[in-house]
């Protein structure tokens, strides 16, 4: 009986923890702390910016592309990743291995050449659950003057299934 009660209590607490997540919508002022004091010199663009999913078999796909560009000079990327917005704040989802930048965006040794766009054409979100939310991709680099700079952009993934 004690084991069953403990099990039910744990199950209840587990369900409550998921129910308490509030996804919400970030304001333009909501920026992760690590980016707040850095100059923005890397352009980041998502297409489409509002991303509706399609369902293929038992998975949902939010298909989009992400592009990065430096207009002021060459940039050495030293960190990149993604945040998710929930509970009224940006939460780090993942910082990626720098080799992933070369593989996915086509840079060489994480160097962005001035005026050269780099595009990850299959930067897709895939999940077995259908839910929307906000993500922010960020890039931190060192510019030609040795300054640490950044770029970031949000993307809204919706729960508006296209192929119902």
Segments predicted by a language model, with ranges:
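The feature marks short-to-medium sequence segments in extracytoplasmic or secretory-pathway proteins
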Residues: 69-112
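Short, solvent-exposed, Trp/other aromatic-anchored flexible loops in extracytoplasmic proteins
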Residues: 100-136
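Proline/serine/threonine-rich low-complexity linkers at boundaries of modular beta-sandwich domains
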Residues: 32-41
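Terminal connector regions
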Residues: 127-164
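Short, solvent-exposed loop/turn segments enriched in Ser/Thr/Gly
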Residues: 47-48, 57-65, 135
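Sec-dependent N-terminal signal peptides
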Residues: 5-15
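N-terminal secretory signal peptides that target proteins for export/translocation
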Residues: 1-2
């Amino acid at each position: 009986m004690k084991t069953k009660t403990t099990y039910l209590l744990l199950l209840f607490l587990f369900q409550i923890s998921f129910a308490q997540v509030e996804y919400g919508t970030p304001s333009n002022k909501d920026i992760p702390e690590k980016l707040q004091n850095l100059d923005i010199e890397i352009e980041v663009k998502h297409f489409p910016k509002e991303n509706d999913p399609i369902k293929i078999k038992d998975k949902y796909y939010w298909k989009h592309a992400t592009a990065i560009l430096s207009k002021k000079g060459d940039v050495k990327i030293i960190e990149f990743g993604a945040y998710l917005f929930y509970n009224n704040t940006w939460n780090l989802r993942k910082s990626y291995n720098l080799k992933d930048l070369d593989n996915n965006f086509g840079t060489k040794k994480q160097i962005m050449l001035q005026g050269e766009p780099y595009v990850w054409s299959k930067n897709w979100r895939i999940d077995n659950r259908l839910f929307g939310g906000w993500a922010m991709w960020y890039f931190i680099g060192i510019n030609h003057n040795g300054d640490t700079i950044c770029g970031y952009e949000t993307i809204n993934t919706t729960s508006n299934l296209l192929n119902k």
